[in-house]
Amino acid sequence: MRLTDLEIAACLEEGSIVIDPRPDAEAISGVSVDVKLGNQFRVFQDHTAPYIDLSGPSSEVQEALDRVMSDKIVIPEGEAFFLHPGELALAVTHESLTLPADIVGWLDGRSSLARLGLMVHVTAHRIDPGWQGKIVLEFFNSGKLPLALKPMMTIGALNFERLSSPVARPYNKRKSAKYRDQQEAVASRISQDK
């Protein structure tokens, strides 16, 4: 069952869900908690590779990703990151999230931003039980105009579901957890798939 605003507030108070910095009461509404945009981004650089062979050897996949992904881009306070039509960028939430083994989280984009063509997460919106770290956002501008994204703007909302029992292998305990404790806009680690 999805947690209500009262249940979310209680989980934050007791520490079973940790959001740091802790959101104001106004950020919790209905069944969600608003999250803000952090100041770190990554983009695909200009490149000459015609494609990335995701089924190729791990080392070749990683080399290709290293060639096309930018270094971390940090946007100073008060300035904006411009996402142009047809572009994909990675960003990160301002907040860090910690979930227990019996709660799964979901990230939803804002309807007001979607109506401008902004996808906040391309596909990955589930946050596994046991997650710890910031949430990487996969932005895509499907609109017709560039969008100015400023750190600390409300970018999405988290909602939570309590599971019938704790999971046997929470994310932060899995050896295969590629994004454990992420604190910045981490590029794809698909080359680490087994």
From Swiss-Prot:
GO molecular function terms attached to this record: dCTP deaminase activity; nucleotide binding
EC number annotated for this UniProt entry: 3.5.4.13
A single GO BP: dUMP biosynthetic process
Functional pathway: Pyrimidine metabolism; dUMP biosynthesis; dUMP from dCTP (dUTP route): step 1/2
Record carries keyword Electron transport: no
InterPro entries registered for this protein in UniProt: dCTP_deaminase, dUTPase-like_sf, dUTPase_trimeric
Pfam families: DCD (PF22769)
UniProt entry keywords in alphabetical sequence: Hydrolase, Nucleotide metabolism, Nucleotide-binding
Superkingdom per UniProt: Bacteria
Nucleotide-binding recorded as keyword: yes
Region Disordered: start-end pairs: 172-194
Record's catalysed reaction(s): dCTP + H2O + H(+) = dUTP + NH4(+)
Record: active site: 138 (proton donor/acceptor)
Sites where the protein binds dCTP: 110-115, 128, 136-138, 171, 178, 182
Disulfide bridges in this chain: none
CDD domains named among the record's database cross-references: trimeric_dUTPase
Self-association state and partner proteins as the record states: Homotrimer.
Role description: Catalyzes the deamination of dCTP to dUTP.
Family note: Belongs to the dCTP deaminase family.
UniProt cross-references to HAMAP family, sorted A to Z: dCTP_deaminase
Protein name as catalogued: dCTP deaminase
Native source organism of the sequence: Shewanella loihica (strain ATCC BAA-1088 / PV-4)
Taxonomic path: Bacteria, Pseudomonadati, Pseudomonadota, Gammaproteobacteria, Alteromonadales
GN (gene name): dcd
